């Protein structure tokens, strides 16, 4: 059977068929497979699209595109982008993106017979315009069709020196060619045909050599049993069939033209234990990669360094260091070698902190243009001077994060999961190898944390709002399946990238689940608080059976007066019989209400009494400044349990209603403490200062922001701040231990007194 007779195949000339007969039978029926066989064969017009005649339906589509482009030709690019952003979910959004591309080509390119311009250079400028206007660009294949449609007489030629040649469009040029020559150019591997949501920056020609050096270094690092077992478990779970179309793993991507795919990368240990191979010595490094363009090993770990900064390189084969502001697993390290399923086997311990009420995002910012990722230089293990590679990776990852944030903002959660699935495939092998390198894992972790922070800021007003049930169902589905989805997507990539992406997603999923629990319990508590009869029943049982002074004296060992006053104020909020108008506006007659409360009242909360109670508990931690957040939550839970126990033992009827309210208080206060610790950026600034202090040899002065250059000049003051922070934490730990010892002594004394009273009573009775 002649291959040209197959449906959809382009007719080949006799000379082309002779070349085809010499190929392998498997390759014979795939014309695209013949492209890399012979360089002269690439320029034959018989297998290119120039000789192909479009079908009738294609002619109609091209005519329609030309007509639409002619109608919108007088519009500015800003107005076209605004219309595209408004109709980005409609059925005609893809066609209108093509119209935008044609309009941009008419403004940016012009025909000239003796001109030639790189094919990727035109696409790079188009992507840059789309990035500045915050719209999703077309992929390179669709954009190339538009170039052919607008300029049908151009030809594609491969020009340049051997080994450095690039594809060029011959017959057109960019308008103002001199102004574009100052910009960097793309290499052919910098863009992928499926890159439809990334905004890449131009990458120099030596970028692939730089990444291959990193890859060769990574391949020589020995893999630990824990990481291999963990990655194998995740890969085993990844191949399980799933009904979710977004949970399918992506195809494996060959790295830098290698014949083997990256199926299971080793776990990267500390680089100082593995020196660079002989083939990567300074004498063998190409001239364009000299002077620290290949990342150097990290300096040896100093014993005198603080615990907060004791790991210059993340150890992915073991658990995190306790005491840091990040989330640490509570499992034993030996158990982490047996299972890596974060969704079911790892329990995370969040840093808790009660932020002031005015710092909580009750009214989040909707300006996505202000979003920015942390600089890469602060989170690199060693000096890395390839500015172009870092800029390209940062720009692509920033666009990916912005797309995810906007998907959650408009509740397009299917698009959220689809973007996560398509992101690895949209990267070129060079950028994917750089993303999987252990030198950038710390930056990826911080970037994902910044992105998830912005998403939680958008969702934070749901704490006390009435949310439609379909939205709750979608968010609950996202919280339950995000970790498994990311694990299946990155199962075929390096183990360090898989672990970082999975851990940050698990933290976000836990916080999102906590937010949904707060919203559910708030609705349940509002049913009782909005009913005057239930509230009257609670207050009646409280007056009859609860003695706040006795409960505080029995459960706590400090701040008795303040704790008694807090319980009495809580009772006064419950006992207030509000009229319907006051329920809608509980702060109508309270001039001392804070601005935060006024902002939340404007958001039309669930219930006035619930809103007032939320304000009370939100301000309550500030009354106990010497109490840590975790100790505060334990004491609050002990007081509520004691109140419930007194009412239950005494036969009160308000136990059920008070129990539901208590559940909401526990969830709400835990959520406020967890989100406060997660959104707190004071530790991030301190960590960046420390990274600047220790990596000053690898960061040029021009790359350091002005507000951080002062810290580089005052190293002694920074060390004093670190020592002061250590001493303050040590004092706090000593104070907590003394408080626990006093509490235990008080409990023991109470038990002894109780036993003596029982014995005296029995003796008197006998």
Curated annotation (Swiss-Prot):
Keywords: DNA-binding, Nucleus, Phosphoprotein. Residues 101-176 bind DNA. Residues 271-308, 708-731 are annotated as: Disordered. Residues 290-308, 715-731 have a biased composition (Low complexity). Belongs to the RFX family. Positively regulates cyclic AMP-dependent protein kinase-mediated exit from the mitotic cell cycle. This is Protein sak1.
